[in-house]
A protein has these predicted regions:
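Active-site His/acidic residue clusters
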Residues: 264-286, 332
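Non-catalytic accessory regions flanking glycosidase/transglycosidase catalytic cores in CAZymes
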Residues: 20-258, 292-517
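Active-site pocket-shaping loop/turn-to-helix segments
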Residues: 285-293
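Positively charged n-region of N-terminal signal peptides that target proteins for export
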Residues: 1-5
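Bacterial N-terminal signal peptides
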Residues: 6-16
Length: 517
């Protein structure tokens, strides 16, 4: 009888283990505070503002005569919210728009500026009220640096060279005199300058070899004072295409400081059926996360090629367009790319940050698309009202990682599986912050189950732990103008430190950022 009971107990236990989801199993790992890695450049948390839909006008710019409270035409609420994020850099004016933008259309008295046509995004008139001076005034207001994207597609080396002289020269020339007449006698400091955008597509449909010659031609004439030269960024590849990295890094020459890279996360398998921003099920939840995790593969593939020609990692790999892209909302202009922003987008943002951190030795700037009212936005506006998205809150939670030092992590994580899709259930990164604390970012991709986690801390002693959590009940939980605080961070008290070990149960579909002191 005793043997029968033991046998039955074993069968029941085996059946229980077999039926358990992967996330019923604990995760264990190590934070290597004893092996500090690369600096996580604050520019990994950059923004992108294109003349597209309501991204600039109504989003950032309302004009000085607007009833919406503003300073010099910039929305007070948006400026204040962006300052809270410690935005390091903003990319402008595009995007595809950059290769049809002629900078002279956006300087001088606003009433005298020409109205042009935005052929890329909805075929709508472009007032040019927001131009060079307005952009540089704006980034100064929010405490950010400037990343300007030059026009290769419909421009010329002379046009680009004159724009850079207008921006940076301190010599008495006709261009600097014009700048002074337009209200800015002193030159600006431009941190980054790109020679074209998506030259494989909307920027000219070029081959890497053809664009290489174009880049070197333009770079020859982009002359600035030695101490005012921006980082020159070449238009690089996208998705799994590594040919651009191979061609540009092997032959780009001394003027090449970085190459760009673009990758968007879509739930579907092709651009004609990307998937919905809201009202989706768990199948689109996991497919979205599986697709966003490909960012790691793409960075690794490009970095391996760059390492062949640039082992000292002098050339940066800048992901200056990334984020989610869904089908347009019914009833809205498709070319305006307005979409809602949910808890899923917050998880996507956190996953990408953890990926970028691991490649901080090569990835030194990224720019999410886009800042306000476009794609995976930080902020949505409607008339005088403003709402902060779940993605905004993730950027805010990750502020301690800006200019922190990467601490390598090891994690034995279970997998989250649904049908044919399977992804790691947990994502983690850690860093030593400027204040000496250890920041730990954790993401639970499983929308149904919490996961117990234990992380040993090697090479450091911490006595206290505090944190924040972002989660919600629904997969597509979102903030609206009627309910602006439906998804927002809350204090997290579920982590315990004991004997150099950090233990917690990471709630389902959550982002948690901890500070260990």
């Amino acid at each position: 009888m005793r043997l029968i009971v033991i046998a039955c107990t074993f069968v029941i236990l085996l059946a229980t283990l077999t039926s358990m989801s992967a996330t019923d199993l604990p995760s264990a790992g190590v934070i290597h505070a004893d092996q500090p890695g690369a600096k996580i450049d604050r520019h990994l948390y950059g923004q992108f503002a294109e003349h597209l839909g309501r991204g600039i006008e109504e989003g950032v710019w309302v004009g000085e005569d607007s009833r919406i409270p503003n300073v010099r035409g910039f929305r007070n609420d948006v400026v204040a919210a962006l300052r809270e994020l410690h935005v390091p850099v903003v990319r402008w004016p595009g995007g595809c728009f950059a290769d049809e933008y002629h900078w002279r259309d956006g300087i001088g008295p606003r009433g005298s500026r020409p109205t042009t046509l935005n052929t890329n995004w909805g075929g709508v008139p472009e007032s040019n009220a927001f131009g060079t001076h307005e952009f540089l005034d704006f980034v100064q207001l929010i405490g950010a640096e400037a990343y300007i994207n030059g026009n290769v597609g419909t421009g010329s080396p002379r046009e680009m060279a004159e724009w850079l002289q207008y921006l940076t020269s301190d010599k008495p020339t006709a261009l600097t005199a014009e700048r002074a007449r337009n209200g800015h006698p002193e030159p600006w400091k431009i941190a980054y300058f790109a020679v074209g955008n998506e030259t494989w597509g909307c920027g000219g449909n070029m081959s890497p070899e053809h664009y290489l010659d174009v880049f070197r031609q333009y770079a020859t004439f982009l002359k600035t004072p030695v101490d005012a030269r921006p980082q020159l960024i070449a238009s690089g590849g996208h998705d799994e295409d590594t040919s651009w990295a191979d061609t540009l890094v092997s032959k780009g020459g001394r003027d090449l400081n970085a190459i760009s890279f673009h990758y968007y996360t879509i739930p579907g398998n092709h651009w004609r059926n990307k998937g919905s921003a809201i009202g989706f099920g768990e199948d689109q939840w996991i497919s979205t996360l599986a697709h966003t995790l490909k960012m790691d593969d793409f960075i690794r593939a490009n970095a391996a090629i760059m390492d062949k020609y640039d082992p000292q990692k002098k050339v940066a790999f800048d992901v200056d367009e990334w984020g989610t892209w869904y089908d347009p909302e019914t009833g809205r202009e498709p070319g305006f790319l307005y979409q809602q922003n949910t808890l899923r987008d917050a998880v996507v943002a956190a996953l990408n940050f953890n990926i970028f951190h691991q490649h901080a030795d090569r990835v030194r700037m990224t720019n999410i698309a886009q800042m306000v009212n476009v794609l995976q936005a930080m902020i949505l506006t409607k008339g005088p009202r403003m709402v902060l998205t779940p993605t905004y809150h993730v950027f805010h939670m990750f502020r301690p990682f800006q200019d922190a030092t990467l601490l390598p992590t090891e994690l034995q994580a279970p997998r989250y599986t649904l049908g044919s899709e399977s992804v790691p259930a947990i994502s983690v990164s850690a860093a030593r912050t400027a204040t000496g604390a250890i920041a730990v970012a954790l993401v639970n991709l499983d929308p149904r189950k919490a996961t117990p986690i234990t992380l040993s801390i090697a090479g450091a002693k911490a006595r206290t732990v505090t944190g924040e959590i972002l989660t919600a009940t629904a997969l597509d939980a979102r903030n609206t103008f009627e309910s602006p605080d439906a998804v927002k961070p809350a204090p997290f008290s579920g982590a315990v430190l004991k004997d150099s070990k950090l233990s917690l149960s990471l709630p389902a579909k959550s982002v948690v950022v901890l500070s260990l002191q």
